[in-house]
């Protein structure tokens, strides 16, 4: 109750502060208008308010505003689609990025008036606003998305791909979540700019039935109050459009993640073996040929029979993680616990497990496994709130419920005490279900609790 009261008090203070600022600038406006004493040059707030009221009460105003808004949003949507496609290609091809970037930088630096005049020559006044908005918004969308894709968490994407999360599910679970902060930043800058570019294009092109045409008419007739009233309407429409679109973008993140979680296991049947359907085929890997950068692995050939258990031991830097990564690439999609933590920090422990789980795994069984491995855990708590040992066991639960013919564990018991390690090892033995099991560790006790006797020492 106190927190609610405090929140309401803070909101009231914010509203009061905003009102005080607005009152100050209205007073400044009234003072300057009184000093100028020329309504044709600078009408006062009262005259502009009357003109604005007259426009609001005219149904034609809303039709004109809606038409201009639709064209502006159409150009913005086209820029978003094309910018996304170009950014996607650029993230996969450095040559393509070098080819596209100069052209978009040139467009970004070109004055709006020059662009509009050229578009009028090429397209005519009817379509000039859509094209102008498209060209003005495209560079901002492209560079923001390209930056977001460049800075995306590559190890986390590797984890998703290895666990069979691909296609639209990978986009919803990872790609969109990674680029969304960049998209939000871009939206705040581009939406307002798009309205300015669109109205400017209508004004220069004198497109019939548009906001730009009405502003031009007000200028010809020296109806300054009407001109300012239309300006207020455009600013309000731009502000409302930005607020709505930014809100929709914010909501899209959790919605996309939820869709990926609900569709767990989608598309994996026929590509990956679910637990209980039989072990993966044997693995024969000439490790030295695959990793020439790792001298410690030179000449090593890894042979693992179907359903076999292998432990790889060695000092830090001996190449254990490299060996397991190569094996995972051969077995993908498979289940893997990486040496470094790879979790979606903003999501719950349960969702982190379910997003990679087999389609036959429901939320109740995933939650039961989490509670077994992490006694007392709130499965709906964000993993960022969990301790290191708890987070480790969330990753182990994810690996055990993920479909695939192999379970690969890289230092899985790091941060666990002996009791937690024993409980976790029992769960691994119960649920790996005859699949190939590869373990990397520096502690022989880890191999013992998992009943692994075949040990490779690097």
Roles of regions detected by a PLM:
Residues 382-386, 390:
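Conserved ABC ATPase signature
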Residues 340, 346-359:
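Q-loop/switch helix immediately C-terminal to the Walker
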Residues 131-135, 168-201, 234:
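Transmembrane alpha-helices
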């Amino acid at each position: 109750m106190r927190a609610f009261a405090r929140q309401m008090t803070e909101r009231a203070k914010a509203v009061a502060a905003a009102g005080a600022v607005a009152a100050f600038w209205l007073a400044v406006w009234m003072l300057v208008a009184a000093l100028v004493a020329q309504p044709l040059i600078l009408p006062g707030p009262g005259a502009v308010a009357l003109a604005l009221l007259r426009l609001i009460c005219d149904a034609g105003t809303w039709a004109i505003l809606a038409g201009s808004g639709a064209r502006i949003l159409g150009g913005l949507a086209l820029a978003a689609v094309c910018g996304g496609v170009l950014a996607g290609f650029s993230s996969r091809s450095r040559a393509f990025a070098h080819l596209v970037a100069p052209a978009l930088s040139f467009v970004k630096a070109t004055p709006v008036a020059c662009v509009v005049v050229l578009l009028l020559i090429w397209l005519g006044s009817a379509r000039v606003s859509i094209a102008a908005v498209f060209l003005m918004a495209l560079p901002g969308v492209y560079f923001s998305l390209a930056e977001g894709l460049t800075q995306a968490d590559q190890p986390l994407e590797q984890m998703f791909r290895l666990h069979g999360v691909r296609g639209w599910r990978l986009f919803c679970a990872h790609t969109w979540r990674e680029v969304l902060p960049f998209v939000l930043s871009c939206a705040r800058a581009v939406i307002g700019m798009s309205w300015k570019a669109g109205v400017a294009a209508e004004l220069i092109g004198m497109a019939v039935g548009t906001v730009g045409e009405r502003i031009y008419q007000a200028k010809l007739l020296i109806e300054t109050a009407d001109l300012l009233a239309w300006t207020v309407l455009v600013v309000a429409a731009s502000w409302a459009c930005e607020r709505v679109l930014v809100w929709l973008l914010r909501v899209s993140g959790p919605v996309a993640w939820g869709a990926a979680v609900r569709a767990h296991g989608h598309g994996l049947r026929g590509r990956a073996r679910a637990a209980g359907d039989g072990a993966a085929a044997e693995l024969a890997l000439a490790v030295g040929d695959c990793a020439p950068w790792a001298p410690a692995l030179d000449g090593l050939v890894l042979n693992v029979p179907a359903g076999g258990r292998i432990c790889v031991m060695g000092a830090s830097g001996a190449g254990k993680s490299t060996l397991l990564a190569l094996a995972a690439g051969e077995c993908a999609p498979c289940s893997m616990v990486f040496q470094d933590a790879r979790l979606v920090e903003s999501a719950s422990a349960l969702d982190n497990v379910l997003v990679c789980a087999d389609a036959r795994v429901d939320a109740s069984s995933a939650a039961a496994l989490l509670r077994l491995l992490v006694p007392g855990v709130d499965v709906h708590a964000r993993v960022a709130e969990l301790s290191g040992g708890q987070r480790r066991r969330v990753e182990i639960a994810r690996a055990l419920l993920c479909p695939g013919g192999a379970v690969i564990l890289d230092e899985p018991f790091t941060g666990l005490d002996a009791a937690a390690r024993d409980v976790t090892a029992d769960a691994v033995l119960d649920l790996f279900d005859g699949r190939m099991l590869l373990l990397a560790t520096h502690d022989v006790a880890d191999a013992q609790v998992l009943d692994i006797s075949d040990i490779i020492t690097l």
